[in-house]
Regions:
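Membrane-embedded beta-strand positions of outer-membrane beta-barrel proteins
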Residues: 1, 21, 32-34, 141-143, ...
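Outer-membrane beta-barrel proteins
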Residues: 1-24, 41-45, 97-128, 179-193, ...
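Transmembrane beta-barrel wall of Gram-negative outer-membrane proteins
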Residues: 1-3, 8-44, 53-55, 59-85, ...
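Transmembrane beta-strands of outer-membrane beta-barrel pores
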Residues: 2-4, 25-27, 36-40, 145-149, ...
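Flexible, surface-exposed loop regions and adjacent strand-edge segments
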Residues: 12-16, 47-57, 61-62, 155-166, ...
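Residues on the lipid-exposed face of transmembrane beta-strands in outer-membrane beta-barrel proteins
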Residues: 19-23, 125-131, 141, 194-200, ...
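Repeated loop/turn-to-beta-strand initiation elements of outer-membrane beta-barrel proteins
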Residues: 27-32, 136-139, 204-207, 268-271, ...
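Structural signature of Gram-negative outer-membrane beta-barrels, strongest in the C-terminal barrel
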Residues: 212-216, 239-336
Length: 336
């Protein structure tokens, strides 16, 4: 699918696909599914901006979206373009028709900034099986793997160098505070796991046991792809090499196993019990996209991430139940 977008610079396209195979006989069924999707969408997440960091259009009578539409800003997108601002009068100029003036963001070579885009791709693979070797036993199992990758890329007009951990100077060694940037922030992820359970039923027993093993790995990253040189800097000091200004990895392991059983004492009385064990581990390390100030070069340092936590849970439960002619009562004890 595709769209031209209503706001300036918000054209986009997306798509998805699906495929699957199934094989079965009287006792065994095997399935495989592949599901994927992608999107590249122009963004306008700043909303309807009524001004800039220096002044507000509200000072010039713009208070509603209808006001903005009437003055030529109905499709204005601050991620795509800027408002002309007169620093002397602290006002936004208007043309003879009363429309506010806008300008497109430009690179140093004169080319126009195309648009801010969000880009993402994801693919899911799922294989499952059900096996019924007898009237008493049923086995279910599934494995899965999902890969995802995405990023957004945006123009950052008149941003501070310190926002990206940079200390910039000109030819006289004077500090330069601001410039135009293009930043790219994104992630990649791998998720995979296994699920299995077995069920046994006869005249007296109903038993179920299962296993769940899940693992997630993710990476967050950020790059500075462009810095305008129009501000005249000749040197930049920063705490990282190249144009990657942060990078962090994270993982989650989630493992659990359970067993439950119900025994029919009589036609009206049952006893039941179950127990679950769960283990969860979180880990993340690397560099955050926030910076702290230093008294000497490189003048800034990335915030460090260092989390490594594990948790274990054991949850038992037991009880007795009574049921007759549509009525049911039970008593149970559990530990959570």
């Amino acid at each position: 699918t595709g769209t031209n977008g209503f706001r300036h610079g918000t054209a986009g396209r997306s798509g998805s696909y699906y495929g699957g195979l199934t094989w079965f006989n009287n006792k065994l069924q095997i399935k495989y599914k592949n599901i994927g999707n992608f999107e590249k969408t122009g963004q306008a997440w700043n909303g309807i901006v009524a001004g800039n960091s220096d002044a507000s259009l509200m000072d010039q009578g713009i208070k509603t979206y209808q006001d903005m539409w009437n003055h030529g800003l109905g499709r204005f997108n601050s991620l795509y373009e800027g408002l002309v601002f007169d620093k002397a009068s602290k006002k936004f100029p208007q043309d003879a028709s009363g429309n506010f003036q806008t300008f497109r963001y430009r690179m140093d070579d004169g080319s126009l900034w195309n648009r801010t885009t969000d880009n993402f791709y994801q693919n899911h693979n799922i294989a499952s099986m059900q096996w019924r070797p007898s009237n008493h036993w049923t086995h279910n199992a599934a494995i899965h793997y999902t890969y995802g990758y995405g990023y957004y890329k945006e123009f950052r007009p008149n941003n501070k160098f310190e926002k990206f951990g940079m200390y910039a100077t000109d030819a006289t060694n004077s500090k330069i505070k601001r410039s135009d940037f293009i930043r790219r922030k994104g992630l990649s992820q791998h998720t995979y796991g296994l699920l299995y359970n077995a069920n046994y039923i006869n005249e007296k027993w109903d038993m179920l046991a299962g296993l769940n093993l899940q693992h997630f790995n993710g990476n967050h990253f950020g790059y500075i792809d462009y810095i305008s040189k129009r501000v005249g800097f000749v040197n930049i000091v920063k705490p990282y090499d190249g144009n990657q200004y942060y990078d962090s990895d994270a993982s989650k392991r989630d493992y659990s196993a359970f067993g439950k059983a119900l025994y029919h004492i009589t036609q009206q009385w049952d006893v039941f019990g179950d127990v679950q064990y769960r283990f969860v581990a979180y880990k993340t390390d690397g560099l955050n996209d926030k910076f702290i100030s230093l008294s000497s070069a490189p003048y800034y340092a990335n915030q460090q991430l260092n989390i490594n936590e594990t948790y274990s849970f054991l949850n038992p439960k037991a009880g007795i139940s009574f049921h007759k002619e549509g009525h049911k009562a039970y008593f149970s004890v559990a530990l959570a």
